[in-house]
A protein has these predicted regions:
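Intracellular juxtamembrane helix-capping segments at the cytosolic ends
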Residues: 60-76, 84, 98
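C-terminal ends and interior cores of transmembrane alpha-helices
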Residues: 25-44, 57
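Intracellular terminal tails of multi-pass secondary transporters
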Residues: 111-201
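Helix-loop junctions at membrane interfaces in 12-TM secondary transporters
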Residues: 40-51, 62, 134-135
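Helix-to-loop junctions at the C-terminal end of transmembrane segments
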Residues: 5-20
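Paired intracellular helix-loop junctions of major facilitator superfamily
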Residues: 42-43, 69-81, 107-108
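A generic transmembrane-helix signature of 12-TM secondary carrier transporters
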Residues: 10, 28, 32-35, 51-53, ...
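Interfacial helix-cap and linker-helix signal at transmembrane-aqueous boundaries
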Residues: 13-14, 101-109
């Protein structure tokens, strides 16, 4: 139940504020806190330890955000399939390695495994905050390229817009009678080569 609430809540937040990287980083804070609790709280405080364990289980919300984020930030049929395969292989590798970090010799505290997880959660949070900066740089490069080609530098990413915003944008487009000439938005180009591609933060 906790995982379901966390998945739905983080997905709603990522859509509401159009920031998937920030959503991943915020979700990663919960298992970080939970892991620290499990490492530091004395064993006799069972309720607190259980609460820490529940916080760690919130990591399940990170997976769907990563899957949707990488798909939105990849263009080109072949590249998208290869990227999806790499992400899937990476997650499967993590699922294989994860249990091996916990040994019966480390019972009952399992400190090496918990410390490894703590480092991993911290890295996820840091990387999720750094990636949007890189994506913003790529968006600026694309905007500059559009200007060089005589196109409008400003593009609106419609993938994260709400229904009301989409309707309003449609009305504005009709009122201005704008037409996009040579728009590569639906071309089978990779995101790096397609100047009309917009990266999602």
């Amino acid at each position: 139940m906790i995982q379901i609430v966390c998945i739905l809540g983080s997905s709603w937040g990522a859509t509401r504020w159009s920031r998937k990287g920030l959503a991943i980083a915020l979700v990663a804070i919960l298992p970080i806190i939970g892991t620290i609790m499990m490492l530091t709280v004395p064993r006799q405080h069972k309720g607190v330890l259980l609460f820490g364990y529940y916080l760690v289980s919130c990591l399940a919300a990170i997976t769907p955000l990563i899957y949707t984020w990488h798909v939105q930030n990849t263009a080109g049929d072949t590249k998208k399939k290869c990227t999806s395969a790499m992400v899937f292989i990476g997650m499967c590798t993590g699922n294989v390695i994860g249990p091996l970090l916990y040994s019966v010799d480390d019972a009952p505290l399992y400190r090496p495994g918990l410390i490894s997880n703590l480092v991993m959660f911290a890295l996820v949070a840091i990387i999720a905050l750094l990636i949007p900066m890189y994506l913003a740089l790529l968006n600026k490069r694309h905007a500059k390229r559009r200007e060089e080609l005589g196109k409008s530098a400003i593009r609106i990413d419609e993938s994260m817009l709400k229904k009301k915003e989409m309707t309003q944008k449609g009305v504005e487009m009709e009122a201005q009678d704008q037409r996009q000439e040579q728009d590569n938005g639906f071309s089978d180009l990779t995101d790096m080569k397609n100047e009309d591609f917009i990266y999602v933060y």
